[in-house]
Amino acid sequence: MIPEIEKLLNDQVKYEANASIHYLAMASWADANGYNGVAEFFYAQSEEERLHMTKLVKFINERSGNAIIPQIDQPEPNYKSLNELFEIFLKSEIFVTEQINHIIYQCLEHKDYNVHNFMQWYVSEQLEEESVARTLLDKLNIIGDDKSGQYLFDRDINTMIPEENTPQ
């Protein structure tokens, strides 16, 4: 495996792991604050990011690389609102997309077409993830501080997402 690409993939392992643990913290906050639907959404998102990380680890090792299991940054334990959760969610997904795009660019620069091909799955995933994050944040922005709207958002969150975008 090309060393520069291996480093980028290991960096991506860390980004996926950090997203997973941060989404777990968000799920815990939502659970503790009575937002059971939002909690289930973020528990599922956390698991999905963990699976993305595992897929990368396996790929690196299968390609005779050395996958590095990262130290995880401490997530924020307290959030101010549902809007803050979903603003962070969107920013996180945009960041991950940018990193994946950088990996793709470097794969083309180094003519590493095998990794480029592998990363196309992540490109598709990120299109979906950003779309979901934007849609949910847009809905929360429409709702504003209306408690009834927040209640309905929490109740219906897992039915608002098209089936192909539902976290596995």
Each language-model region and where it sits:
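Iron-associated oxidoreductase/ferritin-like identity signal
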Residues: 1-168
